[in-house]
Amino acid sequence: MKKMGRFMAVVIAGLLPSLAAAQDIKSYLPVTDERLLHPEPENWLMYRRTYDSWGYSPLARITTKNVKKLAPVWTFSTGVDEGHQSPPIVNNGVMFITTPKNQVLALDAKRGDLLWRYRRDLPEDLFQLHPTNRGVALYGDKVFLATVDAHLLALDARSGEVVWDQVVGDYLSGYYMTLAPLVVRGKVMVGVSGGELGVRGFVQAFEAETGKPVWKTYTVPGPGEAGHDTWPGDTWKTGGVPVWITGSYDPQLNLTYWGTGNPGPFVSEGRRGDNLYANSVIALDADTGALKAYHQYHWNDAWDWDEVSAPLLIDVRRNGRSIKALVHAARDGYLWLLERGADKISYVHAEPFVHQNVFTKLDLETGRPTYDPQRIFGVGRRAEFCPSVWGGKDWPPTAYSPQTGYLYVPANENLCSALTGKQEEYRPGQLYLGVDFSAIELLPSADAKDHIGELQAWDMSTGKKAWVAKFKSHNWGPVLTTGGGLVFLGGTNDRYFRAFDAKTGALLWQQRTNSGVTGVPTSYEIDGVQYIAVQSGWGVDAQRKQELLDKAFGTHTFVPQGGVLWVFALAK
């Protein structure tokens, strides 16, 4: 009875959000399927701007020649601490950003004036590991938000008022959401977080107009479903495999591509088997949610190597052959090149982009790795492995430039980890790791004193690394590429936001901000002026990782918190 009372209080609180409207937006351009398929160069309408997840803006007024004149033109303090990771989404001069704790801000993208603000009242008994949010989706005259208490909201784009509110999961069972929704053909798609809390992951689609559920596809197959036999006993019920980063979409195949997270608990000996569809890319029919194809990057994961970053859809010409590719820089430290088809995902090539000592070889036909058993920890058995639990690259997205043909990877080198397993009993809504969370070890190599963070450029036509920029700090920075031949990146603990020459890797410009820049940068144009926008606000795993590095090095690194949106343009 007590539990029901808490639940009713949460429902009531969810119906009473905090909304501050400075002014309604009188002129708002509705977002259509056509505009999402072919966005205007001056706008940034979705998480990575285009369905192929390139993170590329064709705008070219800011170039390698004049970027040194880039300067702040306005800033906006969000009033919130913790990790700010969402991209500034821009539609016809109106900007939408989100912050931790599910605040949505609508701003005049030219002047920085507040148009409206939405704050969600979150339940007091909510438990999650990541209060962050990675942005909104747009469709019609609505703004869609996936919340940390596992609701999907449709807000009126002009006023911020709630149009509909749909429950996606039970937060008391460990479900929460941090991703930006994906809108395809009138459907809003989301995945869930909670892989460390014993959830059963899924992707679900809803009608954009009404919020009515359309389909739901579990990432851990149940009885009678293909792949169920890769989970012993009842382990599938608490198998994890969350989906917490926005997917990609191929309109020709009508398939959405999603990266999936780790199985649970971390210690793998109690769930022996491949544990499908963990640590994979899955292809789902956009209309029905039917699983059409998958590729598992690594099986029976024991290193917390989520592979949730959606692959980039790139046409690659390699060894005289044209490939409709899926490209993924993985947390497991390998750069994967796959080929996508209507009902198949085929392995083409993979190689490590950071030091990796777990895989001893890959099958030449399938890409399936063979493991060094000494790198697999167990109950009461410690094992060291490289890269670390945060991987060669965590969630911060890569970007691609069609000008250079390069993929740009925000990597972390010279870091390993150690884990020791323990027996763990599943309790709904609580940590289900099989390890002591406070005893996770981060082990810098000798070369870490030289550098940890990297920005790598990989030539997709040759499969070779073209250049690398190195940083003493670890790197938690999403990447933006532009038509001006530039690559933008933050992510370091020195609080700088930087611009590099996309072809050579030369550092051309940098600006120190209030905090660490962990937000996804975007670019847009108004009245002939190109802008670069990014949120600065350190926290969540960037800070957790920094604390472990300080412990390993015997240092103390202070990175101020507090979210600020920075908007830059060329000085006149």
Q: For the regions a protein language model found, what residue spans apply to each?
A:
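Blade/loop signatures of beta-propeller domains
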Residues: 23-72, 219-226, 369-375, 444-445, ...
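Repeat-blade elements of multi-bladed beta-propeller folds
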Residues: 44-48, 83-103, 127-152, 176-197, ...
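N-terminal cofactor/phosphate-binding cores enriched in small/glycine residues
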Residues: 53-169, 481-482
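Extracytoplasmic beta-rich repeat domains
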Residues: 76-89, 117-137, 165-180, 197, ...
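Short loop/turn segments that connect beta-strands within beta-propeller blades
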Residues: 108-111, 156-159, 208-210, 286-288, ...
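Repeat-solenoid scaffold signature
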Residues: 176-210, 300-360, 375-395, 399, ...
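Short, conserved, GDST-rich strand-edge loop motifs in beta-rich repeat architectures
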Residues: 190-201, 258-275, 413-448, 537-557
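Blade-level signature of beta-propeller repeat domains, shared across WD40, Kelch, NHL, RCC1
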Residues: 522-572
